[in-house]
Amino acid sequence: MLTKSRKYFNQTWIESLFKQTTALFALLVFILLAAILISLVIGSWESIKRFGGSFLLETYWDPVQEQYGAIIPILGTLITAGIALFIAVPISFGIAIFLTELAPNWLKRPISIAIEMLAAIPSIIYGMWGLFVFVPLFQEHIQPVLIDNLGNLPGLELFFSGVPFGVGLFTAGLVLAIMIIPFIASVMRDVFSIVPPMLKEGAYGLGATTWEVVRQVIVPHTRIGLVGSVMLGLGRALGETMAITFIIGNSFQLPNSLFSPSTSIASAIANEFNEAGGLQKSALMELGLLLFVITTMVLILSRLMITKMQQTKGK
C-alpha cells in the first residue's frame, strides 16, 4: 500500500513539474519579446525625446550636425521588400504548382533538394554574388537598356530613370527575391500537397484542365496557407541585412527611381552601429525599434487576413 502511495506521489510530482516547466518555457517567449522591446525603447529614448515624430518624416542623416531622420531607410526597406515579393511570389507559385501537379516523380526530389540548398546559402554569399555578378551585369547591360527604352515613357520615368549605378533598390530587390523564393516555394508546396486528391480528381473527371483545377480547386482551398507563405517571405525580406548591405548602395539620399542607391533600416544599422555613440547610437536603436514595429504590424495584419479568410470560408 505504501509503495502504491509513493508511486502515486511520484507520478503526481513529476506531472506537476512537467506542466510547470513547459508553462515556463512558453512564458519565456513573452519574456524575451518584452525584453527586446524594452531594451529598444530604452536605447532609443534619447532620440525619441530629441526628434519626436519628425524622426519618421525627415530625410537627413547627418552625424556631424546630429540631425537624423528615418524616412529614407524606411522607404528603402519597404521598396526592396515590395520588389522582392513582386518577383518572388509568382515564381514560387509556379515552382510549387509544378512540384505538386506536373513534375514526374523522378524530378520532384532533385528540385526539392535544390530549393532547400538555396534556402541554406548564407545571406553574405548572396550579397557577394550580387555585388560581383549582378551589379556589373546590371550597370553595363540591363539598366542602360531599361533607361533608354522605359525612362522616357509617361508614368515609368519615376521607376526607370537616372544613372545606371548597378547598385540600388532594384538590384537589391532582385537579389532579395532570389533569397526568399526557396522559403515561399517550400511553404506553398507543402500547402498544395494537403489538398484532398478527391477534389482534384473530381475536377479532372469533369474535364477541367490543369489551369482550371489550380484556379478553381487548389487556390480556393489553400488561400489561407498562401497568405501565410507570402507573409513569411515578407518578414524574411524586411529583416535581411548582409546581402542588402552589399548591393543597395548605402546612400542616405531620397531615391528618384528604382535604380537609385539607397539604404534600408537593417543595412543602416549594420553600417554605422559599430562606430556610433551618443545620439547617433540612439537614432540607430530607434531604427531598430521601427523595424520591430513594422514586422509586428505585418504579423498582426497577416493574422487578421487569415482570420478573415477562415470566417469567410466557414460561412
From Swiss-Prot:
This is Phosphate transport system permease protein PstC. Coiled coil: none annotated. It comes from the Bacteria. Belongs to the binding-protein-dependent transport system permease family. CysTW subfamily. The keyword Ribosomal protein does not apply. GO terms for biological process: phosphate ion transmembrane transport. Part of the binding-protein-dependent transport system for phosphate; probably responsible for the translocation of the substrate across the membrane. SUPFAM superfamilies: MetI-like. It is a multi-pass membrane protein. It is found in: Cell inner membrane. Keywords: Cell inner membrane, Cell membrane, Membrane, Phosphate transport, Transmembrane, Transmembrane helix, Transport. The keyword Transmembrane applies. GO terms for cellular component: plasma membrane. It comes from Haemophilus influenzae (strain ATCC 51907 / DSM 11121 / KW20 / Rd). Residues 1-22, 99-117, 186-223, 303-315 are cytoplasmic. Residues 44-77, 139-164, 245-281 are periplasmic. One of its GO terms (molecular function) is phosphate transmembrane transporter activity. The chain crosses the membrane at residues 23-43, 78-98, 118-138, 165-185, 224-244, 282-302. It holds the Pfam family BPD_transp_1. InterPro entries: MetI-like, MetI-like_sf, Phosphate_PstC, Phosphate_Transport_Permease. Residues 74-302 form the ABC transmembrane type-1 domain. CDD domains: TM_PBP2. The lineage of its organism: Bacteria, Pseudomonadati, Pseudomonadota, Gammaproteobacteria, Pasteurellales. PROSITE patterns: ABC_TM1. Its main location: membrane.
